[in-house]
Amino acid sequence: MKKLFRAFSLCLTLALCVFGSTAALAEAPAATPAPQDERVITDVSPLEDQIRNIVGFTTSTGGPYDFEQADHRSAVQAYGAEPAEGAVALLRIYARAEDRGDASINSSGHSFLSVRNVSDHDIEVGGLRIAPNTEMTFSPRGNRWEHTGIWYNLEGYYKRYLADSYYQNIYTVQTSLDQGQLDVVNRNLAKSDHWSAYFNCAAFTEGMWNAVCADTLSAGQPYTPENLRNDILAKYGDLAAYNPQIPYDYIVYYGTSLTPSKEFA
């Protein structure tokens, strides 16, 4: 009887292990590779763009980004530098803005982040698995019809198909992430599905970067991409890359639901 009980216990333990592994895999499906075709995309009209911005700025009410802080932080690096020892990923921060002269508040531009897999195995980013030597961008937005909140890979889509209209004069630096730091990024992404005119893409990128990097950045008050860009150049200008390649390795997703975009397919 004891042997039978031990055998049953062993089978139950194995079943739970298998089930747990399967469940973990199910929680992180593989991201779908982006098409690399040469199609011609027509952007929205200036009027529709203005309407989107007005709707986003007046109806989106997301609060602050309350991010977990890593228990250890990495140093800032030049874009393209070799990953630090023990790193599984690189976190890159990007910022750009239009020149608005003496405007008291310049809300133009955009800021976002990317994670590049520098390991020899798949890693999880935002609930999706990405392969070695591939990358995923992400940032919240309030001015796209399908969703207000976190978007993945939209920057790469725009840069591939509408390169002349998006992300000119952009600057970036990077930092290395070990598995523990990447886990912090992912837990913070799970809390990032919102946006408002005040707690915007610049607030998000500042907070996410500072949670894992010892060399902090500021997007100012109010948070703006221009302030973030200026801080990158003031503090780490000798490390910043100008107009780097923006990856488009995977299709566009939005939300914590990881819904594939229909508009940007």
Where are these regions (language model features)?
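Bacterial N-terminal signal peptides that target proteins for export
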Residues: 1-11
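Bacterial N-terminal signal peptides
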Residues: 11-19
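Sec-dependent signal peptide cleavage junction
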Residues: 18-36
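Activation targets extended, charge/polar-rich intrinsically disordered C-terminal tails
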Residues: 28, 37-58, 63-67, 184-265
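Glycine-rich catalytic cores of cysteine/serine-nucleophile enzymes that process amide/ester linkages
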Residues: 62-168
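Second-shell loop/turn segments in exported
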Residues: 98-103, 167-175, 187-196
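Solvent-exposed, acidic/flexible segments
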Residues: 105-108, 175-182, 194-202
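Extracytoplasmic/cell-surface-exposed regions of Actinobacterial cell-envelope-associated
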Residues: 116, 177-179, 217
